[in-house]
A protein has these predicted regions:
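Alpha-helical multi-pass membrane segments and their bilayer interfacial helix-loop junctions
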Residues: 1-520
Length: 520
């Protein structure tokens, strides 16, 4: 590094031509990388010094000769090529001599330097950045596996996300300041979308390769998390830009549906090739389901139309998990069904939809599908290829949430039907609806208690207790304020009947405690 500082000083004082000085600095950096290679071959303790100094010097010279107004000598194409060459040399050193340091400095350094090259006073060209970051990720993931190198992969992913957000910022900032520049910003949008899509495919391939090659206890957190994180980052940034610029939004959401289907195809292919007990499929399946949930409402034109399809997709996914013997896919199906129901609650509470018939149809479909989903889960034990079912939920108690989702959808269906039967101009309409809601909740709870008793099903009994608690909270903390007269009397009476039924059934249940069929 002393020689490098001498070269810089001589160049600054004009003793040698600046262009010649820059080229000498690049040549000296390559020389240090070469010396580092041969030092590693001889197992010299000084080898890391040459490799690190050569890599750092290369990145400093390339960025300065491109950005510094004194130079501006190195165009973007050769600058990025030099970064890639230095990264390849560092990765080759790691691969040949089984040492971590060259890979760490080489890949992370080239990614950082490539991002720095975009911090230019003029409009930067991000197309070269795509190639360099892709090369850094490939080198970081496909170079020989070494212990304690996970931070390199996380760093590369973080830098890739930061670079895309920086790119999006450079595209959208002029538009936010001056809307008339939107036309020129739209010209950059296809390149941004192509770059984000390319990285999405790359990370999917990386995760699939690791899942196929690894074993259950060796698949790291990074490879399990990267598909979902990629969907959140890639779809989120693309959705934001296309929405603000009002361009390619529908196309991006439709393409996302296709990509979500590709995720399921990848899961199917991996399930055919993996060894027994090998996990990791749920990571890719979860990413595909998330992409489906994010993009389908836009493609359908209304969220209320998309929710029944999401519910059906969740049911299909648990059947798919049975064929694949994937506990991860099964857990994803639970989450997707819960998401659809929670989204339905959000739409109804915020009154985002004003079509009663559409709501009734959606609630009816989701009630039926959620219950079928629950029945399938209770008829088929979950695979234990993921830690969730192997350690935390061995008896699949989480499937009870599916029955709860069916009850929620059914409640809104019946509540919508009763609301439609009561004229909007009727006096005391709100109080009447409040009383009817309590009757629906408490009546459902009483029915569940009887169903659980005659079916010897503890799970349904426990859910009935939860529903009764919800009904009681509604009666005493809402109905006493919002209702009066006959609706209030009926509301309180319905809760009393439900608790009476529960009390009688619970007293008789004690006689059946020793029955083997009672277990859920």
């Amino acid at each position: 590094m002393v020689i490098a500082l001498i070269l810089r000083t001589v160049t600054d004082y004009g003793l040698i031509n600046r262009q010649l000085g820059a080229y000498m600095g690049i040549g000296y950096a390559l020389l240090l990388l070469g010396i580092g290679w041969f030092r590693y071959a001889k197992a010299s303790p000084q080898a890391p010094v040459f490799t690190v100094c050569g890599s750092v010097l290369m990145y400093l010279v390339v960025t300065e000769t491109n950005l510094n107004p004194k130079f501006h000598l190195l165009p973007l194409l050769p600058a990025h090529l030099l970064l890639i060459v230095s990264g390849v040399i560092a990765a080759a050193t790691t691969n040949r001599f089984r040492v971590r340091l060259p890979l760490s400095i080489g890949t992370v350094g080239m990614a950082l330097a490539a991002i720095v090259l975009t911090f230019h006073e003029a409009a930067p060209d991000f197309r070269f950045l795509i190639v360099t970051l892709l090369a850094a990720n490939i080198l970081g993931h496909f170079t020989v596996r070494l212990d304690r190198c996970a931070w390199v992969r996380w760093s590369l992913f973080g830098l890739t996300v930061f670079a895309s957000l920086w790119w999006a910022y450079r595209i959208i900032l002029p538009v936010l300041a001056e809307p008339s520049t939107a036309a020129s910003a739209r010209l950059q949008l296809p390149w941004f979308l192509a770059g984000v899509g390319l990285f999405g495919c790359a990370y999917l391939a990386i995760a699939a390769r690791e899942i196929l090659a690894g074993k259950t206890d060796r698949i790291g957190t990074y490879f399990l998390a990267i598909p979902t994180l990629t969907v959140l980052w890639a779809f989120g940034s693309a959705q934001y830009l296309t929405t603000v610029l009002n361009s390619y939004n529908y196309q991006i959401n439709f393409l996302s549906l296709v990509v979500s289907a590709i995720h399921l195809v990848v899961v199917w292919v991996l399930s055919r090739k993996r060894t027994e007990g090998q996990g990791g499929l749920g990571a890719i399946c979860n990413a595909g389901a998330l992409l489906l949930a994010l993009s389908l409402p836009t493609v359908m034109g209304s969220a209320i139309y998309a929710l029944p399809i999401l519910s059906i997709a969740a049911y299909a996914l648990i059947i798919f998990s049975g064929f694949c013997q994937s506990g991860g896919a099964r857990l994803t199906s639970y989450l997707l069904q819960i998401h659809a129901t929670v989204y339905l609650i959000f739409l109804l509470i915020t009154k985002k939809t004003n079509e009663p018939l559409d709501v009734l149809v959606a609630c009816f479909i989701m009630t039926i599908i959620s219950y079928l989903h629950y029945q399938w889960a209770r008829s088929n034990r979950p695979p234990t290829d993921i830690r969730f079912f192997e350690r935390y939920d061995q008896k699949d108690f989480s499937a009870a949430l599916l029955l709860l989702m069916a009850l929620v959808s059914g409640f809104f269906m019946v509540e919508g039907m009763t609301s439609a039967l009561i004229s909007g101009d009727s006096p005391g309409r709100l109080a009447t609806l409040t009383g009817l809601q309590s009757i629906i909740i408490n009546g459902t709870a009483a029915g569940l208690v009887l169903w659980g008793y005659f079916g010897r099903d503890v799970e349904k009994r426990n859910i009935a207790i939860l529903v009764i608690v919800i009904g009681g909270l509604k009666v005493f903390f809402h109905d006493l304020v919002a209702a009066k007269g006959l609706p209030l009397v009926v509301s309180v009476l319905s809760f009393g009947v439900a608790t009476a039924v529960l009390s009688v059934i619970m007293s008789r249940w004690q006689k059946r405690m020793a029955t083997p069929d009672e277990a859920p």
